[in-house]
Swiss-Prot record:
Enzyme Commission number(s) from the entry: 4.4.1.22
Protein function: Catalyzes the condensation of formaldehyde and glutathione to S-hydroxymethylglutathione.
Lineage of producing organism: Eukaryota, Fungi, Dikarya, Ascomycota, Pezizomycotina
Entry protein name: Putative glutathione-dependent formaldehyde-activating enzyme
Keyword Zinc: yes
SUPFAM superfamilies: Mss4-like
GO biological process: formaldehyde catabolic process
Origin superkingdom: Eukaryota
UniProt family annotation: Belongs to the Gfa family.
Pfam family for this entry, one: GFA
Binding site for Zn(2+) 2: C47, C49, C52
Pathway assignment: One-carbon metabolism; formaldehyde degradation; formate from formaldehyde (glutathione route): step 1/3
Cofactor(s), names only, from the UniProt record: Zn(2+)
Amino acid sequence: MPSIHPLIDNGITKGDEHFKGGKLYCHCPSNKVEVTLSSNVAHNHACGCSKCWKPKGALFSVVGVVPVDALSVTANGNKLHVVDSSAAIQRNACKDCGVHLFGRIVNDHPFKGLDFVHVELSDSKGWQEPQFAAFVSSIIEQGFPPNQIDAVREKFRKEGLQTYDVLSPTLMDLIATYTGQKSGKLSSKL
């Protein structure tokens, strides 16, 4: 089976609940883009969508979120560009090596105020481990053989990760709550 993701293939390393953050780096050999996170990530998960950056050969990304005010570009920010300005998540990638350093939502959205990051871009240890796998069936749209998808789901199960073809129930509930509040069907003070 191809690589699920380097952070998952050989077993998941538990994170440190007291971890305070660290630096992310692009893959350039010099003049690396550096992003500093002043907190650990939340909702860290494997994602099979076609938009997320994935390490070479991996079927999934591993992506978590931090509050926008916990992220700062601390070196070579001039090398960043937005990959797709029409996407809900504005993925900021290095122009030279193509690595996505962070994704920011700029329009009205349930997750506005959170930045999406890939902790494998850090040398620091202690980041929250993956909590679940999302958009699993989306790898089929990208060319993965449908008759092998059950083996992918089984690999996640063996690692203790629940698989979804959307986000986790908690995140889907947050989206539904946001949508209900925006439509006026739910009180804005829950």
